[in-house]
């Protein structure tokens, strides 16, 4: 794009290189210095060990990596200054007068797409290749404290495209002309915080799975191509990054006290102003859950404002795949409607800031199934028509023709089933999918209906009949007779996607007309999926279709190929969307980087944290794996237990890559629980759920009951002494010195919590005592010392010692100096540094009690969350 003010280049006043600058020579890393070039005497004073925000002189906005992404190819743009890691840059000298701009969040550098020398070539985030297009000369602006950045490759400067003031305007290279949109101020980042004793900036990423959870909604913006959002039942909301071809999480900022907001009941993207996004957030309607909230964004989910609601929402309850319940009036986009589960219909006329119940709407409770309103949909702009579906067996569809002032039940509607989705096509037809239960489980019947909104005629257009329902529904905005639907709970032979190009008169199955590529997430296989309640057709591309499943997303760019007898191609479209919930994780020394145990997916082994695993832990597959442990002195020996497979426990002798099920089990009727393995692998102690601990000395072939411990006592192995195990039970610390056969009490009056043993140090124990803080024992649990610096602790883990120290680095999930978060200590708990930030809080991850450092890489830490996957952090 050409710069509209480039009619005549405005030259800068140049100064000759000063003698002082000539004498300085090449600046040294880690000190403050003056930058200089052959054409500029002294530009800005820069601390090479610091990070800076680069503020546009023209707009006042800062240089920003889109969506906190860590992916190569992510666009660089200007954005409102939020002082977040993706807006912070280190200026790294190349040693010859040029600099790389290193992003704090990703560790990657700013470069020009394709190494281009062309005008208007886009700036993007790239892996450092020491390329000339990634290197910049920094020059001063006469009479100002601003600087310019000139590309070594092209000789052009960093420029905000079109002299724009807009949020999200792209950064490009353009010939220098002296414009304010090419000038930048360097604002040094001050690392501070009440809980910090030093700089703790980290880059956070997911150990990728690509999906792993239930995607309940997919919503395209109707005005802007490529703008797409996803909602999940317990992992928050996401925005699609077209350039990086992956999802960007939008709700990781939700903290522990607001964890209930990570279940997204519904979302709406503004058809008039694409920057506006609304989330109806709330996970449960139980008494113990907090009320829901509307999260309002004017920058596509980068930041939110919150309106608390006087009722609860149920983003992880029955019927969560229905919708959308939150919609925007296409004629008056400041007006929104929200259908609730137990409180009727609500309206806002000020972009979601305030809400009032629509008193005229007849249903103000949960209706037949307790799930209330299933969907709300507006008619064409200016029509004043609204349709509302309700989960009621007798009256399930209402219509208003006066903007919601009055309502009538639609005559002739089907009964006995409840609507899942309702979509109006461009020709005035209303399509609806029905099931005999809210779903996503428990559905045994269903149908698809078409309603002629002008004539009032109903027609059953179900593509098939059987012991299953219908849920997902999409109509092509460009072709109103093209309709797609999905089955729900058709467990045999499998669920199905149907497609019609004649308004439902005839249908084609898609599973037998498609080729499926699961290479992004091989563990999912190429089956069509289940719980396919979210289905959407791109309003700008009829071939681009996506649908959600209980495990993620499938996508196609040629779904319309089957219309003419061809074959469509589908691929996993869930990269970046991580919705798994974890029970345990370990990082054995010198072996696999990470082995996990989690719900629904069982577990994975990672040799490369940047790549999705090739498959689940198998032989046996334990779909809900609750515990994993390894032998400290023989880390190739790994054990895991859980439920949901043919066996409940297994052993690996090669670091988690291959497995064999235990030949025996303590209590055949029980499962799950926790397992510990001796430091040398000579014995296992397994406590199944509701049972006493049992011990095996023959690698799981036989088991004998442990003496001295009660039911559900969790056992921990000493990480040095092979004969020693510990258990914290009802405030008493027990120990065994005979390989777990017999336990005796050593200390009492202890708080409940999670007990952990330090690798390689006999008798060194840490107790995360919940609200009582953190306790430490160096004598095998005979005595404990409470750390005054820690107010509460959910879990503590250990990793490689910091350079120059010998004791393991400590990682804490807890509260220090009034601040809750993730902390690191390199001095045995005397001082703590917070290493997560307010943008990375992941809801109630503390409740999972999963934190471990990496034994081979100092500073790396792994955090298991409840719905946002396995997070790992590295110092930036």
Go through each PLM region and give its residues.
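Extracellular glycan-interacting surfaces
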Residues: 2-43, 189-876
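Lectin-like carbohydrate-binding module/patch detector with strong preference for beta-trefoil
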Residues: 22-32, 44-191
């Amino acid at each position: 794009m050409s710069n509209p003010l480039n009619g005549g280049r405005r030259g800068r006043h140049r100064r000759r290189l000063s003698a002082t600058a000539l004498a300085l020579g090449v600046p040294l890393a880690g000190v403050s210095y003056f930058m200089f070039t052959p054409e500029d005497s002294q530009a800005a004073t820069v601390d090479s060990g610091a990070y800076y925000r680069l503020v546009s002189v023209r707009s006042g906005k800062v240089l920003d990596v889109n969506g906190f992404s860590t992916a190569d190819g992510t666009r660089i743009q200007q954005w409102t200054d939020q002082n977040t890691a993706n807006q912070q840059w280190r200026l790294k000298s190349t040693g010859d007068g040029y600099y790389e701009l290193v992003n704090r969040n990703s560790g990657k550098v700013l470069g020009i797409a394709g190494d281009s020398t062309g005008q208007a070539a886009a700036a993007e985030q790239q892996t450092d290749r020491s390329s000339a297009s990634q290197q910049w000369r920094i020059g001063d602006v006469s009479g100002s404290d601003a600087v310019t950045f000139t590309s070594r490759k092209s000789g052009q400067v960093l420029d905000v495209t079109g002299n724009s003031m807009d949020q999200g305007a792209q950064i490009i290279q353009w010939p220098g002309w002296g414009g304010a949109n090419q000038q930048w101020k360097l604002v040094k980042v001050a690392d501070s915080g009440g809980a910090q004793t030093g700089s703790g900036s980290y880059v956070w990423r997911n150990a990728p799975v690509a999906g792993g959870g239930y995607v309940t909604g997919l919503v395209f913006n109707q005005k802007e191509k490529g703008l797409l959002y996803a909602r999940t039942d317990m992992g928050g909301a996401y925005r699609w990054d077209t350039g990086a071809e992956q999802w960007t999480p939008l709700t990781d900022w939700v903290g522990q006290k607001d964890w209930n907001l990570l279940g997204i009941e519904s979302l709406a993207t503004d058809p008039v102003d694409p920057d506006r996004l609304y989330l109806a957030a709330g996970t449960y309607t139980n008494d113990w859950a907090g009320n829901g909230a509307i999260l309002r964004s004017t920058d596509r989910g980068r930041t939110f404002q919150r309106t608390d609601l006087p009722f609860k929402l149920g983003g992880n309850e029955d019927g969560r795949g229905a919708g959308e319940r939150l919609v925007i009036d296409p004629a008056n986009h400041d007006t929104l409607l929200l259908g609730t589960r137990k409180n009727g219909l609500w309206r806002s006329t000020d972009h979601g800031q305030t809400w009032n119940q629509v008193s005229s709407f007849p249903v103000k409770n949960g209706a037949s199934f307790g799930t209330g309103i299933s969907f709300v949909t507006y008619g064409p702009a200016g029509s004043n028509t609204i349709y509302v579906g309700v989960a009621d067996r007798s009256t399930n569809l209402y219509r208003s023709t006066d903007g919601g002032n009055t309502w009538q039940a639609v005559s002739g509607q089907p009964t006995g089933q409840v609507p899942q989705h309702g979509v109006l096509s461009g020709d005035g037809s209303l399509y609806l999918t029905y099931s005999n239960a809210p779903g996503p489980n428990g559905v045994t019947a269903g149908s698809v209906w078409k309603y002629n909104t002008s004539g009032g005629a109903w027609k059953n257009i179900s593509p098939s009949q059987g012991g299953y329902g219908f849920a997902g529904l999409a109509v092509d905005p460009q072709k109103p007779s093209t309709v797609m639907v999905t089955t729900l709970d058709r467990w045999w032979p499998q669920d199905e996607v149907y497609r019609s190009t004649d308004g439902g008169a005839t249908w084609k199955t898609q599973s037998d007309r498609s080729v499926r590529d699961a290479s992004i997430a091989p563990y999912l296989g190429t089956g069509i999926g289940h719980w396919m309640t979210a289905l959407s057709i791109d309003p700008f591309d009829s071939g681009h279709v996506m649908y959600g499943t209980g495990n993620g997303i499938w996508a196609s760019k040629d779904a319309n190929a089957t219309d003419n007898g061809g074959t469509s191609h589908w691929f996993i479209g869930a990269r970046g969307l991580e919705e798994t919930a974890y029970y345990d994780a370990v990082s054995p020394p010198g072996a696999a980087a990470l082995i996990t145990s989690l719900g629904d997916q069982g577990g994975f082994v990672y040799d490369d944290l940047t790549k999705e695993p090739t498959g689940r832990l198998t032989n046996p597959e334990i779909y809900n794996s609750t515990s994993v442990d390894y032998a400290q002195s023989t880390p190739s020996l790994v054990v895991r237990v859980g439920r949901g497979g043919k066996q409940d426990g297994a052993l690996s002798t090669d670091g988690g890559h291959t497995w064999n099920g235990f030949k025996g089990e303590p209590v055949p009727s029980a499962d799950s629980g926790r397992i510990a393995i001796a430091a040398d692998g000579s014995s296992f102690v397994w406590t199944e759920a509701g049972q006493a601990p049992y011990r095996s000395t023959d690698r799981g072939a036989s088991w004998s009951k442990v003496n001295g411990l009660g039911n559900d006592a969790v056992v921990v192995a000493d990480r040095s002494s092979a004969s020693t195990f510990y258990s914290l039970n009802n405030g008493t610390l027990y120990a065994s010195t005979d390989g777990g056969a017999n336990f005796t009490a050593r200390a009492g009056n202890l708080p409940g919590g999670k007990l952990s043993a330090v690798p390689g140090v006999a008798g060194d124990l840490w107790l995360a005592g919940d609200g009582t803080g953190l306790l430490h024992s160096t004598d095998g649990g005979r005595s404990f010392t409470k750390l005054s610096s820690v107010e509460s602790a959910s879990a503590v883990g250990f990793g490689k010692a910091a350079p120059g120290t010998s004791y393991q680095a400590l990682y804490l999930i807890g509260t220090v100096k009034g601040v809750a978060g993730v902390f690191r200590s390199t001095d045995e708990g005397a001082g703590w540094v917070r290493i997560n930030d307010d943008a990375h809080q992941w809801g109630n991850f503390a409740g999972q009690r999963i934190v471990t450092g990496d034994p081979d890489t100092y500073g790396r830490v792994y955090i298991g969350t409840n719905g946002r996957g396995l997070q790992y952090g590295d110092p930036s």
